Design a protein with these regions (language model features):
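The feature marks the mature, well-folded catalytic cores of soluble enzymes
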Residues: 1-343
Length: 343
């Protein structure tokens, strides 16, 4: 049956997409779920955590006279203008005020903080399945509430769509070695092959239990492949991108078991771990001929731009400094509702 919610390939022609809004409430450093991440942060990053504690992006004026929300939304608008050139339908979630989050989830969730910019992680569309994911950090759990209204609207005007949810984890404390965890930044839809990135050991993001859950849910129709990535890599989409069939951007040194066999005989643009810090793999295909790539003050990502252009791909560059400083970029900020390869 025809559906207006459908994704078949990472590089299918993009027709409908959700872009997050740059509203974030930064958590209190005393929250246990935040303290466990301190060991991964530099001194400068820790100072930023403490200076932003309890504030929203509308209350942070580190680059006066504009606040962080305004700076990030300006970058979003540049991205949106590109989508408009291709007649892509855009959805934006409503802002979730602290009072609503407190009412729905409790004071502890507000204390832990929450994010609304990076729409990629709370859910994924595989075929005509909308799958709400169970994220590993409490900071990412409340935001799914803002997408449900969009889902309801789309389903009311679609046919054959399945909307399901992974098992939800009610507590702020979780066992990352037992509870199934998945985040959209670790999932790539490539026809009947689904790649799921997991980090070895005590996963900070998606884990093996999450991979097994997705494999069992999708069944024999899909081949779900686990991709082991090195500790320190936030998500699979920080080291992998598929601009079109036969062409992949990846960081081979971040792949524990080497390049997945799915990409045998493909043209590979291999990036270093240092390049991956500039989020040059976190771009977004509009279709197989057009690609959006971010850059910032430190990482211009010019080499990747030239590599893609030399292969006939038109690259749109978007300045994304204020997103990149929070380890997010173009793919993180967008979640396709409709993508389909045109034959």
């Amino acid at each position: 049956m025809k559906s207006d919610i459908y994704v078949d390939f990472e590089y299918g022609k993009l027709k409908e997409v959700i872009i997050g809004i740059p509203y974030e409430v930064y958590g209190d450093p005393s929250a246990p779920c935040l303290r466990e991440n301190f060991k991964y942060l530099s001194k400068a990053e820790l100072e930023k955590v403490f200076s932003r504690a309890g504030k929203s992006t509308k209350e942070i004026f580190e680059k006066k006279p504009r606040n962080k929300y305004e700076l990030m939304e300006e970058e979003n608008e540049k991205l949106i203008n590109i989508f408009k050139k291709f007649d892509i339908k855009i959805y934006r979630p409503k802002l979730l005020p602290k009072e609503l989050i407190k009412e729905k989830y409790g004071e502890d969730v507000v204390k832990s903080g929450y994010i609304q910019q990076y729409s990629r992680d709370p859910f994924v569309v595989v075929g005509n399945n909308i799958i709400e994911l169970s994220t590993s950090t409490p900071v990412r759990r409340a935001e799914i509430f803002s997408y449900k209204e969009i889902f309801r609207h789309c389903i009311a005007h679609s046919q054959g769509v399945k909307w399901i949810s992974m098992p939800k984890i009610p507590s702020l404390e979780i066992d990352k070695n037992k509870d199934p965890l998945l985040e959209g930044g670790d999932i790539f839809v490539l026809g009947d092959t689904i790649l799921v990135g997991t980090v070895q050991g005590n996963a900070k993001r998606s884990n093996e239990q999450g991979y097994i859950w997705l494999k069992n849910y999708l069944g024999n129709k899909y081949k779900v492949i686990q991709v082991h990535i090195k500790e320190g890599v936030l998500h699979l989409d920080c080291i992998l991108s598929v601009p079109r069939k036969g062409l992949v951007i990846l960081c081979s040194e971040a792949l524990i078991n080497g390049i997945p066999s799915y990409f045998n005989d493909w043209d590979i643009i291999d990036i270093s771990l240092e390049e991956s810090k500039g989020l040059c793999a976190n771009g977004l295909p509009i279709d197989e001929e057009n690609y959006i790539l971010s850059y910032n003050d430190k990482y211009k990502n010019e080499r990747i731009k030239l590599e893609l252009e030399s292969r006939g791909i038109n690259v749109f560059m978007v300045y994304f400094e204020n997103h990149n400083e929070d380890c997010g970029s173009i793919r993180c900020s967008c979640n396709p509702l409709f993508r389909k390869v045109e034959i």
